[in-house]
Swiss-Prot record:
PANTHER family: V-TYPE PROTON ATPASE SUBUNIT A, VACUOLAR PROTON ATPASES. GO terms for biological process: defense response to Gram-positive bacterium; embryo development ending in birth or egg hatching; locomotion; negative regulation of locomotion; nematode larval development; positive regulation of neurotransmitter secretion; positive regulation of programmed cell death; proton motive force-driven ATP synthesis. It is a multi-pass membrane protein. It comes from Caenorhabditis elegans. This is V-type proton ATPase 116 kDa subunit a 1. It comes from the Eukaryota. The gene is unc-32. Belongs to the V-ATPase 116 kDa subunit family.
Length: 905
């Protein structure tokens, strides 16, 4: 660690600790081999192509026609897919990953898809026509049946019509405009009237048809008002549900027949029928003709049923055959399309025989990339090998962190804050341990942790089946994607629950308590006899009740019974523990920043950032941790001599919070806990508790304060001085030094010696505000001031922020205790069958509330708090997060994104 190493020369490091080393390479492909080479790179998924034609629109690129052909094939396949889903035919998806077809195979695929689409469209068109004819014939069948009844009723009512009465649907009033259809009131002779009536009936016209049931009331009203009552309307509902002849949707319809007189009314009635989208059908006048037509209609219906069944069978066979290959075809087409999209990123040389690309790729995978190019060249039959040349560049490479299904969830947690700057320390491997651990500190309960662990185990053991099921629910996908994170959170929660000795708010006496009951039974009985006395608290003095040996692992179960001071003890322990964990993680973050400074050869950052930060952190916060541990180790309940001072007992245990305040205020305090006469000082817990404490603390405070101006001004000053020296050196070199160079003419065989000023390359900077270009001192000072203030204030605020570990742990334990006391414990006070039934019922209530409130809600809360502690308190000490993600050309990724987009539609 003491030797500087440049990027690319450092010792091999697993990719999980830093992002993979990347290089920019230039790729030369023969036109004939370019398609196959890109296909092989897509299968490999380790190359990110750069767009060398950023100013060229998508419609002006070389392979735009091929992309359009792929779009058209994809459209046809989506049409086939929709038709297959419409018939509820399962599509075969074996998970097979076919190779990308050759360019010449596109013609065969296009022909296959064109044939399938045309055949299916023709079958659909024929089926639609047949269904329309079938619906029309079905409606005509119902019309012929119903109109026969109508005509029979009209024959009985003829004389009523002739006398001015209306039919069942006709309406008459005494108004002038509502006269009867035929007025023969002036005829006195019965025979003459009969003959005139028969002649009039011969002049009556009628139309018959069907109309949707919900339109019938409005249809009747408009007919009555438009025709002034001079029509005779009869309707009857069709019991069967018919398909609409236009849309094909199932609808309820009614048969109607309208009688009228004259061409004017006929025209008006037809227009009204057309307006209400009623369908009119021809209907013969005589019963014999209607009977013959009905027989013909029934015959045609039966024939249509046969033809329609055959058409549907043929359509089904076509779709079943297509369903076996449609997923594979989609995969092939999408691969072809992605290849041509990638080829559009290439430059084409002037000879049109070579394609040039620039790619980002991992240095460790160059051999595999070259092998893929060789396979592509061999498969294409090209005699010219493909060339991959590494390039020098000042551009920041993309960040590529290798992951697997276990580490992916933790890497996503880190990347959600920001993609790591190229080659800086990756927090993910440390997050794998610290994240579930800090979560468990807040969530610690063996019972709830076991529930979480079992749920995660289910997702892990059934992951293949669950992946194959392709469940689209977003909440499920969130839990399933983080199954390994949940698994570790559950495992660590069981561990911290064991440390807290907490199982559903209860403790387990595994090793035997270190406390003994020293209270006589007579005293206990005395307190239990009287209700008021029973509310008093019995105290176990540690001098007599504690055997001096701590509980082997975790918290002594006796504290679960200590109603009076249980919270005081646990709060003090968890509060100090939170501070220890927080300062330890922050210190580790600062140490990781040293690794970054070493890697990037930033000596100024090491001298004037890392070292002052460690001194500042150690002078105050690490010193506080030492005090916490010392208090736990040396200051017990029993008095004695501690660190050279006489210690009277627990009442003189030092107060660390007030002591820290006095340290900054440099307040004078008593040395030790007792005076020379052996009397205990009043407020002895405020005294100094080891020799030389006051002097040491003054030195630490001064040392911490001195680091602030060092962090603020030292680095900008040395950057400024370095910049001045480089500027002076460049000026002197430009004025005094010249060098000779050779200018050659490629069209002639001679050359000349010329003189030109030497160009001094600018140093590459490794810090903020320096490097290429002039140094802007204002920007450097502002940047340095922001980071200094952020670190100094952050050390205080972040330490306080870690107290959320204590707060959430307390809240979780108290909520668990309330749930046990208020719900499940009530079942234990009942005896017999009533108690058994109550226990059965209350257990399910208790279990449901535990899962939904304590596991899910409290678990989500602890998860978010752990997320904040890592993003802000931990990663702010060393993590830049200013990089961009490596996005390789990968068929697997492209197909997965397409599948996800389909499922979200």
């Amino acid at each position: 660690m003491g030797d500087y190493v440049t990027p690319g020369e450092e010792p091999p490091q697993p990719g999980i600790y830093r992002s993979e080393q990347m290089c920019l390479a230039q790729l030369y492909l023969q036109s004939d081999a370019s398609y196959q080479c890109v296909a092989e790179l897509g299968e490999l998924g380790l190359v990110q192509f750069r767009d060398l034609n950023p100013d060229v629109s998508s419609f002006q690129r070389k392979y735009v026609n091929e992309v359009r052909r792929c779009d058209e094939m994809e459209r046809k396949l989506r049409y086939l897919e929709r038709e297959i889903k419409k018939d509820q035919i399962p599509m075969l998806d074996t998970g097979e990953n076919p190779d990308a077809p050759l360019p010449r195979e596109m013609i065969d695929l296009e022909a296959t898809f064109e044939k399938l689409e045309n055949e299916l469209r023709e079958v659909n068109k024929n089926e639609e026509t047949l269904k329309k004819n079938f619906s029309e014939l079905t409606e005509l069948k119902h019309i012929l049946r119903k109109t026969q009844t109508f005509f029979e009723e009209v024959d009985h009512d003829r004389w009523r019509i002739l006398e001015g009465g209306s039919g069942r649907r006709g309406r008459s009033t005494e108004r002038e405009e509502t006269r009867p259809l035929i007025d023969i009131g002036d005829m006195d002779d019965d025979s003459a009237a009969r003959m005139s009536a028969q002649a009039a009936m011969l002049r009556l016209g009628f139309v018959a048809g069907v109309i949707q049931r919900e339109r019938l009331p409005a249809f009747e009203r408009l007919l009555w008002r438009a025709c002034r009552g001079n029509v005779f309307l009869r309707t009857s509902e069709i019991d069967d549900v018919l398909n609409d002849t236009v849309t094909g949707d199932p609808v309820n319809k009614c048969v109607f027949i309208i009688f009228f007189q004259g061409d004017h009314l006929k025209t008006k009635v037809k227009k009204i029928c057309e307006g209400f989208r009623a369908t009119l059908y021809p209907c013969p006048d005589t019963p014999q003709e209607r009977r013959e037509m009905s027989i013909g209609v029934m015959t045609r219906i039966e024939d249509l049923k046969t033809v329609l069944g055959q058409t549907q069978d043929h359509r089904h066979r076509v779709l079943v055959a297509a369903s076996k290959n449609v997923r594979m075809w989609l995969t092939k087409v999408r691969k072809i399309k992605s290849i041509y999209h990638t080829l559009n990123l290439f430059n084409i040389d002037v000879t049109q025989k070579c394609l040039i690309a620039e790619v980002w790729c991992p240095i460790a995978e160059l051999d595999r990339i070259k092998m893929a190019l060789k396979r592509g060249t061999d498969e294409s039959g090209s005699q010219v090998p493909s060339i991959l040349n590494r390039m020098e560049t000042n551009e920041a490479p993309p960040t590529y962190n290798k992951t697997n299904k276990f580490t992916k969830g933790f890497q996503n947690i880190v990347d959600a804050y920001g993609i790591a700057t190229y080659r800086e320390i990756n927090p993910a491997p440390y997050t794998m341990i610290s994240f579930p651990f800090l979560f468990a500190v807040m969530f610690g309960d063996m019972g709830h942790g076991a529930i979480m662990l079992l749920a995660a185990l289910f997702f892990i053991l059934k992951e293949k089946q669950l992946e194959a099921a392709r469940i689209k629910d977003e909440i499920f996908q969130t839990f399933f994607g983080g199954r390994y994170v949940i698994f570790l959170m559950g495992a660590f929660s069981i561990y911290t629950g064991f440390m807290y000795n907490d199982v559903f708010s209860k403790s387990i006496n595994t090793f035997g308590s270190s406390w003994q009951n020293t209270i006589p039974e007579s005293v206990i009985d005395y307190y239990l006899d009287d209700e008021k006395r029973s509310e008093s608290q019995l105290i176990l003095p540690p001098e007599t009740a504690f055997d001096g040996n701590p509980y082997p692992i975790g918290v002594d179960p006796v504290w679960n019974l200590a109603e009076g001071n249980k919270l005081s003890f646990l709060n003090s322990m968890k509060m100090k523990m939170s501070v220890l964990f927080g300062i330890a993680q922050m210190t580790f973050g600062v140490l990781l920043s040293y690794q970054n400074f070493i890697y990037f050869k930033s000596d100024l950052d090491i001298k004037y950032m890392f070292i002052p930060q460690m001194i500042f952190l150690s002078s105050i916060f690490i010193y506080l941790c030492i005090q916490i541990l010392s208090k736990w180790l040396f200051f017990g309940a029993v008095g004695g001599t501690v660190l050279g001072y006489k210690y009277p007992g627990s009442n003189c245990a030092p107060s660390l919070l007030i002591g820290l305040i006095n340290m900054f205020m440099m307040k004078s305090r008593n040395a030790g806990f007792v005076d020379d006469s052996g009397e205990t000082y009043p407020q002895c817990y405020l005294s100094t508790w080891y020799p030389g404490q006051a002097t040491i603390e003054i030195i630490l405070v001064v040392l911490a304060l001195v680091q602030v101006p060092i962090m603020l001004f030292a680095k900008p000053y040395f950057l400024y001085r370095r910049d001045k020296q480089q500027s002076r050196y460049s000026t002197l070199t430009a004025e005094s030094n010249q060098h000779q160079s050779v200018r050659a003419d490629i069209n002639q065989d001679d050359a000349e010696v010329v003189h030109a000023p030497e160009q001094t390359p600018k140093p590459s900077g490794h810090g903020h505000g320096h490097g290429d270009g002039p140094l802007e001192m204002g920007d450097v000072m502002v940047y340095q001031a922001i980071h200094t203030i952020e670190f100094v204030l952050g050390c205080v605020s972040h330490t306080a922020s870690y107290l959320r570990l204590w707060a959430l742990s307390l809240a979780h334990a108290q909520l668990s205790d309330v749930l046990w006391t208020m719900v499940f414990r009530n079942a234990f006070v009942l005896d017999g069958y009533t108690g058994a039934i109550a226990t059965y019922i209350l257990f399910f209530i208790f279990g449901s509330l535990s899962v939904f409130i304590l596991v899910l809600m409290e678990g989500l809360s602890a998860f978010l708090h752990a997320l904040r502690l890592h993003w802000v308190e931990f990663q702010s000490k060393f993590y830049g997060g200013l990089g961009y993600e490596f996005a390789p050309f990968s068929f697997e990724k492209i197909l997965a994104e397409e599948r996800e987009a389909e499922e979200n539609l």
